[in-house]
Regions:
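...captures the hydrophobic TM-helix bundle architecture rather than a specific catalytic motif
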Residues: 1-231
Length: 233
């Protein structure tokens, strides 16, 4: 499980490497770098999953592993952390994402051969993989939102990969604009939830802690009473 940070950051490093060097690299070298990188993190994902599912359980339940550090603090109770969360679902998703991405990379080596944007394509694939991995191991809903947006950006770049073709550009713009509407309401929901619960963390929101939701209900009740009193005056 100590490999998780490598699993997450290696695709980002690959994206930066291929993006910065771009045409300085020969196409097949760029493709090989991207594919080998994915092969490494796919292998590490399988090792991570094996270690996680064979580890001792706590009261018969798989342990939730959380590694995080504080990033932004708004108050004593409300802050945003950056970190990694490992539970059965996220560990399995690491395996699924890296496996599918590796197969896409291998297939693309021959499918994209001779394309002028070969290096750029593999850079975008690495960014997409990084975004998906960050999405499934996020420790809080705001961090998940950041990676959700990165997934949208990656999709936009891949859909509009052939930017000289008007239809590709139009499809990319359409996908980007439509998803932004949904993302706006997603963000509003996050802000409303954090305002009433005073937390972004998944472990607190899903813990069943009655005090969190009691505070939210109490705040809603007070707001309603204040509104009624003000309107009566």
């Amino acid at each position: 499980m100590q490999y998780t940070i490598v699993i997450l950051l290696l695709p980002l490093f690959t994206f930066l490497l291929l993006g910065l060097l771009n045409s300085k690299l020969k196409p097949m070298i760029a493709g090989t770098i991207g594919t080998v990188s994915l092969a490494i993190i796919a292998t590490l994902s399988y090792i991570c999953a094996f270690e996680y599912f064979t580890a001792d359980r706590v009261n018969g339940v798989f342990e939730t592993v959380i590694m995080k550090t504080e990033w932004l603090r708004f108050s004593d109770t409300l802050h945003i952390d950056l970190g990694l969360l490992l539970d059965p679902i996220s560990v399995m998703m690491l395996v699924i994402i890296t496996t599918v991405s590796l197969m896409v990379h291998i297939y693309s080596l021959s499918y994209m051969k001779g394309d002028g944007g070969f290096q750029r394509y593999f850079a975008f694939l690495s960014l997409f993989t990084f975004s998906m991995l960050g999405l499934v191991v996020a420790t809080n809903i705001f961090q998940m939102y950041i990676f959700w947006e990165l997934v949208g950006v990656s999709s936009y770049l891949l859909i509009g990969f052939y930017y000289t073709k008007p239809e590709a550009v139009a499809a990319a713009k359409k996908a980007f604009i439509v998803t932004r509407f949904a993302d706006l309401f997603f963000l509003i929901g996050i802000l409303v939830l954090s305002f009433y619960t005073q937390t972004f963390d998944f472990d607190i929101l899903t813990s069943g802690d009655a005090s969190v939701f009691a505070n939210a209900s109490g705040a809603t009740f007070i707001d309603r009473k204040s509104t009624r009193l003000n309107s009566s005056h």
